[in-house]
Structures are given as structure tokens and as C-alpha cells.
């Protein structure tokens, strides 16, 4: 059985720790497959990380545009948000030209508006896309017809219990934290 070369383009974890949860889940899923996979990992475009600081000098170098010898590119996270998908045309064109299959795994949108879906569909419909494993039903319903194979999946962060070894803490059994700047919902008093 041929070894597969797979490029996983995950979310940038330094500015959004939540991205690490699905990135690690995807790594776990791929390592659990019976076929030997050479997994290469990178994060989405770094200009996103710096855009919050209004940086115009952020690096626009994208290693994804220079890949060679990849059997699959795996796209994950909210990559079907219109602000993200606009940037991926050159990578999708190169994948199509090189015969590299594109998989959207643990993938979703961002705002889920009609405008976003229309814009994303307009770009994605130009390409032959291999597989969609959505992280939510809205994404599945919006894009399932654009892929050769489509599955109404879950976010790969749900696989954390399969690979993360926890330790006992001297705390209540359920403690919830959020990592954003706004106040989260109160689940318990």
C-alpha cells in the first residue's frame, strides 16, 4: 500500500486556542487510519493573525501555494467563511492542476449568512473537490453537492477524550472556561 502525503492546513492556534482542539483531533483521526500517512501540518495564512492589529506589513508568504507531491490537502476549521475562502483560490487551482485531492475535514462556515454561502459556493463550484466532512449540519446542507463525497460530520475536537490523558484535579467535576474577550453564557449559578 502506497504511503500518502497529506498537507493539513489547520487554524492558527497562537491567536485562537480553540483551533488547537480540532487540529489535534484531525491529527488523531489521521493517525488512527490503517494506511501509512506522511502528515505535514501548517496553519492558515498568517496575515489573519496580524490583521487584528491592522498590520499591512504582515507576511503574505503562504507555504501552501508552494506544495509539491501531496496526495491530499486537508482544509479545516471555519475555512468556508467568505473572508477565508477568498484567499484560497490559488491553492485550489494548483491542487486541481497537480491532481491533489482536496478534503474539507471538521470544516464549517463563519457567519452562515446567505451572502457568505453564495460567495463560498461561487468559488468552490469552480473546482473538483474530493470530500467534505462538515462540522455542522448547516455547512453540510450548504455545500454537500460540491464534493464527490459528503458527510454530515462533527468537529474533530470531539475526539479529545480518545487521545488526551487527563489527570485528577481538586476542582468541581465540570468547570467551563471560554477564551474570548466577551462574557460567555452562565450555565450554572
Question: Residue ranges of each PLM-predicted region?
Answer:
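Active-site anion-handling motifs in enzyme catalytic cores
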Residues: 1-189
Amino acid at each position: 500500500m502506497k504511503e500518502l502525503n497529506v498537507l493539513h492546513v489547520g487554524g492558527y492556534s497562537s491567536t485562537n486556542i480553540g483551533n488547537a482542539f480540532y487540529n489535534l483531533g484531525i491529527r488523531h483521526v489521521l493517525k488512527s487510519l490503517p494506511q501509512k500517512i506522511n502528515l505535514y501540518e501548517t496553519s492558515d495564512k498568517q496575515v489573519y493573525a496580524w490583521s487584528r492589529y491592522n498590520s499591512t506589513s504582515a507576511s503574505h508568504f503562504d507555504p501552501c501555494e508552494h506544495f509539491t507531491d501531496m496526495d491530499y490537502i486537508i482544509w479545516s476549521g471555519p475555512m468556508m467563511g467568505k473572508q477565508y475562502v477568498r484567499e484560497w483560490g490559488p491553492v485550489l487551482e494548483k491542487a486541481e492542476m497537480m491532481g491533489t485531492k482536496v478534503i474539507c475535514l471538521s470544516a464549517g462556515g463563519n457567519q452562515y449568512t446567505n451572502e457568505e454561502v453564495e460567495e463560498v459556493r461561487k468559488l468552490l463550484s469552480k473546482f473538483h473537490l474530493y470530500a467534505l466532512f462538515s462540522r455542522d449540519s448547516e455547512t453540510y446542507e450548504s455545500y454537500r453537492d460540491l464534493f464527490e463525497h459528503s458527510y454530515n460530520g462533527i468537529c474533530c475536537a470531539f475526539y479529545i477524550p480518545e487521545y488526551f490523558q487527563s489527570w485528577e484535579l481538586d476542582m468541581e467535576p465540570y468547570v467551563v472556561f471560554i477564551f474570548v474577550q466577551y462574557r460567555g453564557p452562565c450555565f450554572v449559578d
